[in-house]
């Protein structure tokens, strides 16, 4: 199994390190043709407007949508969730539009208002998961086929729809590998 990490911007290294700890072969994906070389793909946190601009400049956006629609398992964190969302509230931004959610960008505040908390994620075990929110988006609406796996303050923070897992916080910034392991199970 080979897992790609989209290498255009953001927390690329942290996701690669998490996957290496789990003994998984990785590929930092920087070219459209590399999307055919991976069994699953992580879209890291970063800055969503920069990420979509780079994807378009590299002609990777359409290929990425094609691969996701073909069933490529994808794990998006923070800005990656914004890229996948069908709708963005109160902000005009290009997106891939493959996940049936509405998001609000930077909903928890600016960088200085970033925070950590613990969330319950029954799908990965009974122990609380340390969630780090950095300029995180908020999922304000989910489609009927979107499964909510975790919430914070009654808002979804971890959702799944088919082959897509989307997390508004940064699991790659913790030592807890349970969400990466959960994603690998989706890929198998």
Swiss-Prot record:
The keyword Hydrolase applies. Gene3D superfamilies: 3.40.50.880. Pathway: Cofactor biosynthesis; pyridoxal 5'-phosphate biosynthesis. It catalyses: aldehydo-D-ribose 5-phosphate + D-glyceraldehyde 3-phosphate + L-glutamine = pyridoxal 5'-phosphate + L-glutamate + phosphate + 3 H2O + H(+); L-glutamine + H2O = L-glutamate + NH4(+). Its EC number is 4.3.3.6, 3.5.1.2. The keyword RNA-binding does not apply. The active site is at 78 (nucleophile), 170 (charge relay system), 172 (charge relay system). GO terms for molecular function: glutaminase activity; pyridoxal 5'-phosphate synthase (glutamine hydrolysing) activity. GO terms for biological process: glutamine catabolic process; pyridoxal phosphate biosynthetic process; pyridoxine metabolic process. It comes from the Bacteria. Keywords: Glutamine amidotransferase, Hydrolase, Lyase, Pyridoxal phosphate. InterPro entries: Class_I_gatase-like, PdxT/SNO, PdxT/SNO_CS. L-glutamine binds at residues 46-48, 105, 134-135. Pfam families: SNO. GO terms for cellular component: cytosol; glutaminase complex. Catalyzes the hydrolysis of glutamine to glutamate and ammonia as part of the biosynthesis of pyridoxal 5'-phosphate. The resulting ammonia molecule is channeled to the active site of PdxS. In the presence of PdxS, forms a dodecamer of heterodimers. Only shows activity in the heterodimer. Belongs to the glutaminase PdxT/SNO family. This is Pyridoxal 5'-phosphate synthase subunit PdxT. The gene is pdxT.
